[in-house]
Amino acid sequence: RVTGLSTAPGNGYATLGSGTRAVAPALIAGAAFGQLELLEAGTAAEAFARRSGRPLAGAIGQVNTNALRDNNSSSSFGGELGALGDRLAEGGVSRGVVGNADWALRFVGTTDLPRREAALALMDQHGEVPCGVVDQSLLVKDADYAFGLRLDHDRVISAFSHCWRGRSVVLVEASDLRRADDYRAFVSSERSDVIEKQALENADSLVGQLLDSVDLERDAVVVVAPSSRSGRVAHLNLFAVHAPRMGTGLLRSSVTRQNSFVSIVDVAPTVAALAGTPQDEGEVEGRPVTISRRGGTPEGRLETLVDANTDAVFRDRVLFPF
């Protein structure tokens, strides 16, 4: 959670990239583009240079970085956008982002804004990500999916493989899940359940394909839900880590000081530590996670988390009924 019970994608991804709570208003949070995408009266690279005063050297540029920085300067949290990206770059770790949660193949009006907030998680302070793809080349038309669009897994895997070289951190967004959740506002609950189930199965398939490119004896894999589901009731989100020599059990951090509970601000310090480039504890709100309860069965740990979520939802409904 960042500003309230529910976390919007912009706030969530901005916080993932900061290690401290950060904000990114929806109207400007998703404006990440590849260099040659069309924007304003030219390319995104030209718009980036015009708005920032510096050329776009990376594959991806967030053209609203200055406005986002102003929003955080005036917030009460003190989040530094791009802190994780800067730390990884300083440590010689390359970065990549792959994903596109757009609703439409062209932007008309405020409902069809670009939804590429994922770039906020690994961009540097200037709004650049050196590798990756966030444009609509990742999408194919599919009438059975939310908004008639879904990710092309072959293109996602290709973009991931291009960035997954040497020491690197690559974020891949299961964007079909994001679109399916956004689509809840336009369909019945029954249709929403069908569409979400299909998106979840598709995301599971994508994760399986990505894991084929990963050496689990050498590489770390982090799974995180950066934002809340749409709707009034907020649920706890998932954060899971598989890393060499980490062992199995439930996570905790010195922020929450509770077994099986961590905070969204703990994600950036955890990723930085796993990459061998730890963030300065004096500069971020979060802390790297540790294993709190070892042993047990996967089924038992899952039951613990399900019960914790049920309790959290009940507590929120009692404390915040409206």
For each predicted feature, which ranges?
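Selective detector of the "anchor" transmembrane alpha-helix that sits immediately C-terminal
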Residues: 317-322
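Soluble extramembrane regions of membrane proteins in the secretory/endomembrane system
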Residues: 1-314
